[in-house]
C-alpha cells in the first residue's frame, strides 16, 4: 500500500527545513524510511513477493545515495537526521 496523503504531509511537516519544503534530502529520506519500514512489514508476511522485494531494494539504494549526499554536504544535519530516524549509522 502506498503512503497516504495525510501521513506524507505529517512526515513533510516534521522534517521540512522551511514551509513548503518537499525536496530537501531530509524530507526525501524520511519519506523513504517510512516506505521501507512499511515494505519490510509486508515482506515479513509475504515472503515470496519478489516484486516487492525488488522495489524495497531500489528504495534502500535511493535512500543510501541521499544519505551519502547529505553526509557530504552537511555532516551535522546528517547526524541529526539518522538520530531522529533511528538509522544504524
From Swiss-Prot:
<dbReference type="InterPro" id="IPR005290">
    <property type="entry name" value="Ribosomal_uS15_bac-type"/>
</dbReference>
<dbReference type="GO" id="GO:0006412">
    <property type="term" value="P:translation"/>
</dbReference>
<keyword id="KW-0699">rRNA-binding</keyword>
<comment type="function">
    <text>One of the primary rRNA binding proteins, it binds directly to 16S rRNA where it helps nucleate assembly of the platform of the 30S subunit by binding and bridging several RNA helices of the 16S rRNA.</text>
</comment>
<dbReference type="GO" id="GO:0022627">
    <property type="term" value="C:cytosolic small ribosomal subunit"/>
</dbReference>
<keyword id="KW-0694">RNA-binding</keyword>
<comment type="subunit">
    <text>Part of the 30S ribosomal subunit. Forms a bridge to the 50S subunit in the 70S ribosome, contacting the 23S rRNA.</text>
</comment>
<dbReference type="GO" id="GO:0019843">
    <property type="term" value="F:rRNA binding"/>
</dbReference>
<dbReference type="Pfam" id="PF00312">
    <property type="entry name" value="Ribosomal_S15"/>
</dbReference>
<keyword id="KW-0687">Ribonucleoprotein</keyword>
<keyword id="KW-0689">Ribosomal protein</keyword>
<comment type="function">
    <text>Forms an intersubunit bridge (bridge B4) with the 23S rRNA of the 50S subunit in the ribosome.</text>
</comment>
<dbReference type="InterPro" id="IPR009068">
    <property type="entry name" value="uS15_NS1_RNA-bd_sf"/>
</dbReference>
<protein>
    <recommendedName>
        <fullName>Small ribosomal subunit protein uS15</fullName>
    </recommendedName>
</protein>
<comment type="similarity">
    <text>Belongs to the universal ribosomal protein uS15 family.</text>
</comment>
<dbReference type="GO" id="GO:0003735">
    <property type="term" value="F:structural constituent of ribosome"/>
</dbReference>
<dbReference type="InterPro" id="IPR000589">
    <property type="entry name" value="Ribosomal_uS15"/>
</dbReference>
